[in-house]
Amino acid sequence: SGEYEDAADSDIVIITSGMPRKAGQSRLELAQANVNILKDITPQIVKVAPNAIYIIVSNPVDVLTYVFHKISGLPERQIIGSGTILDTSRLQSVLAKRFRISPKNVHAHVYGEHGDSSFVPWSLVHIANNHVNVYRDSSPDRDRIKWDNENEYAGIEEYVRTSGGQVIK
């Protein structure tokens, strides 16, 4: 908190303003209230820090990143939406625990809009430079990590997709 002038000439500004999501409320239900807040603050913050890189983390992050871009008039290269970055970290963490390896060896990403429409392209998931199925089947621990691909993948995706909502509850 503070005054907009406190951010004058900042290199990076992180936008966290917005109403918090309530239990059972979707990110998209937050949209109008948080768009109105963003419309109010954007001209003021951009005026004092026109050259900053802006990182949008308020929900719904994808909508607000787009709105911030349109309102601010700043070039795309100055605006970052956190999007599915947190979801990707959750996915990598779940797979690392499942395979008992470092998350550094998990190469997997979540795509789409942060929230209910996100998805994991399983054909691109690699563990220690092997496709997830190859790694799973060749692991000395394979009896413990056997799974039904379709159900296991769906369960992991659902966990990743709903974890943010669990924090709110």
Feature annotation, model-predicted:
Residues 11-14:
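N-terminal Rossmann-like NAD(P) cofactor-binding module of classical short-chain dehydrogenase/reductase
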Residues 21-23:
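N-terminal glycine-rich phosphate/adenylate-binding segment common to multiple enzyme folds
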Residues 26-93:
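Rossmann-like NAD(P)(H) cofactor-binding subdomain of soluble oxidoreductases
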